[in-house]
Amino acid sequence: MRPSRRAPDELRAVSLERGVVKYAEGSCMVKFGDTHVLVTATLEDRLPPWLKGQGRGWVTAEYGMLPRATLERTRREASAGKQNGRTVEIQRLIGRSLRATVDLQALGERQITVDCDVIQADGGTRTASITGAWVALADCIGWMKTRNMFKGTAPVLRDNVAAISCGIYNGTPVLDLDYAEDSEADTDANFVMTGDGRIIEVQGTAEKTPFSQDEFLALMALAKKGVARLVDLQKMAVA
């Protein structure tokens, strides 16, 4: 029995609310159970120096946690003077995941910066961030379309992107781990996938004991089911 009493293939209660920030070109409040992340997408007329003059744009991401997003206060990274390795890893993952389905040529010489701020953390902050980031990005691109900022007719967003965690808890493959499950899991993995089921990235770790190929395939099957549900929710959020 899972601590949450969910079925092995059951997501937490998920909500995606688009357009929650007044000033941002795109935004989304994403909730995976008790994990809450505020995501904004900002359009900027600037590019990394190495991209200037190439006629294409860029999508990048930043990630952070509020001090009391966790059970005990976490020191702000700004006060420490640097980001920790986990933060850098996660924000690079978010950026890579979003760029996988964006037509950067169609975007033109512009940058969209996606900020993911964790308000409350109960496991799966990176997967919630990616799922909400796509909605905020779609919101931003929709804002640009209403202002005729694209020259061609080709879609700038070629597909959805969503992410979910899976793990082996008490010998059973389960979907969408919360903190209680994640901290006790034998294995945990994060899957980032497109709307049509293609894989963008997989991160898997044996926390206690190595896992078999069959167990991995069971986790991937759960992830595909979970991502399909998340994509449905994304489509409803941006409709």
Curated annotation (Swiss-Prot):
Catalytic activity: tRNA(n+1) + phosphate = tRNA(n) + a ribonucleoside 5'-diphosphate
Annotated positions binding phosphate: R86, G124, T125, R126
Record-level GO BP terms: rRNA catabolic process; rRNA processing; tRNA processing
Pfam family, one: RNase_PH
InterPro entries: ExoRNase_PH_dom1, ExoRNase_PH_dom2, ExoRNase_PH_dom2_sf, PNPase/RNase_PH_dom_sf, Ribosomal_Su5_D2-typ_SF, RNase_PH, RNase_PH_bac-type, RNase_PH_CS
Top-level EC class: transferase
Family annotation (SUPFAM superfamilies): Ribonuclease PH domain 2-like (SSF55666), Ribosomal protein S5 domain 2-like (SSF54211)
Superkingdom in the source lineage: Bacteria
GO terms for MF: 3'-5'-RNA exonuclease activity; tRNA binding; tRNA nucleotidyltransferase activity
Membrane recorded as keyword: no
Record's keyword terms, sorted: Nucleotidyltransferase, RNA-binding, rRNA processing, Transferase, tRNA processing, tRNA-binding
Assigned EC number: 2.7.7.56
Subunit structure of this chain's protein: Homohexameric ring arranged as a trimer of dimers.
Described purpose of this protein according to its UniProt entry: Phosphorolytic 3'-5' exoribonuclease that plays an important role in tRNA 3'-end maturation. Removes nucleotide residues following the 3'-CCA terminus of tRNAs; can also add nucleotides to the ends of RNA molecules by using nucleoside diphosphates as substrates, but this may not be physiologically important. Probably plays a role in initiation of 16S rRNA degradation (leading to ribosome degradation) during starvation.
Family note: Belongs to the RNase PH family.
Name used for this protein in its record: Ribonuclease PH
Lineage: Bacteria, Pseudomonadati, Pseudomonadota, Alphaproteobacteria, Hyphomicrobiales
